[in-house]
Amino acid sequence: MVDREQLVQKARLAEQAERYDDMAAAMKNVTELNEPLSNEERNLLSVAYKNVVGARRSSWRVISSIEQKTSADGNEKKIEMVRAYREKIEKELEAVCQDVLSLLDNYLIKNCSETQYESKVFYLKMKGDYYRYLAEVATGEKRATVVESSEKAYSEAHEISKEHMQPTHPIRLGLALNYSVFYYEIQNAPEQACHLAKTAFDDAIAELDTLNEDSYKDSTLIMQLLRDNLTLWTSDQQDDDGGEGNN
């Protein structure tokens, strides 16, 4: 029998060593024990996979940019090599996302009770995020499918958060931040993105007195990010004469 506490300890250790693949593997094992995760365990899982997928997303963006430049040069051999390397990174990224999505569907979301609103929103947001990461690299019909799955998860999380969580709750704010990025970057819908971000920011400002001391730092940081995005997006729209964002 695997010792749960040992696995969690290993994940903490791996995080300190910045060995995020090891951290993710340990937290995957914890999740597969099929018992609800504590808040700390939930955060360890999230941080681990965010770093694992983040490295691939970053590599993919760099290689995609090189691929565009190489295509302009017309060097066939180099174009083929760059394309093959991009596809290799894509496969890795997709495997990480599918790993997380299967943990969410088979254990984490499934095991949330009706009243565990915070966990449910946390995991549905995560589901929206990982389908969004798939959408960043997908094309055609495949892209349409993952975009729809991302929208569905974000939308469900958004409804639950509005009904059951304070506007200043960091998980509710973090969801609004990522959902608005989804509208802006994936759906190419800057107006919806701005509306969602502005509403979340304004609702939180109106209830600043409900800010929990423990989450004060987290909440205010996310509010700042919402405001930064709004500033950027509205200036983009003005630059484009009210057109679409350039991401």
UniProtKB/Swiss-Prot annotation:
Domain of life: Eukaryota
CC terms in the record's Gene Ontology section: cytoplasm; cytosol; extracellular exosome; focal adhesion; membrane; mitochondrial matrix; nucleus; presynapse
Positions carrying Phosphothreonine: 145, 234
PTM entry text: Phosphorylated by various PKC isozymes.
Assembly and oligomerization: Homodimer. Part of a complex that contains DSG3, PKP1, YAP1 and YWHAG; the complex is required for localization of DSG3 and YAP1 to the cell membrane in keratinocytes. Interacts with SAMSN1. Interacts with RAF1, SSH1 and CRTC2/TORC2. Interacts with ABL1 (phosphorylated form); the interaction retains it in the cytoplasm. Interacts with GAB2. Interacts with MDM4 (phosphorylated); negatively regulates MDM4 activity toward TP53. Interacts with PKA-phosphorylated AANAT and SIRT2. Interacts with the 'Thr-369' phosphorylated form of DAPK2. Interacts with PI4KB, TBC1D22A and TBC1D22B.
UniProt function note: Adapter protein implicated in the regulation of a large spectrum of both general and specialized signaling pathways. Binds to a large number of partners, usually by recognition of a phosphoserine or phosphothreonine motif. Binding generally results in the modulation of the activity of the binding partner. Promotes inactivation of WDR24 component of the GATOR2 complex by binding to phosphorylated WDR24. Participates in the positive regulation of NMDA glutamate receptor activity by promoting the L-glutamate secretion through interaction with BEST1.
Protein name: 14-3-3 protein gamma
Gene assigned in the entry: YWHAG
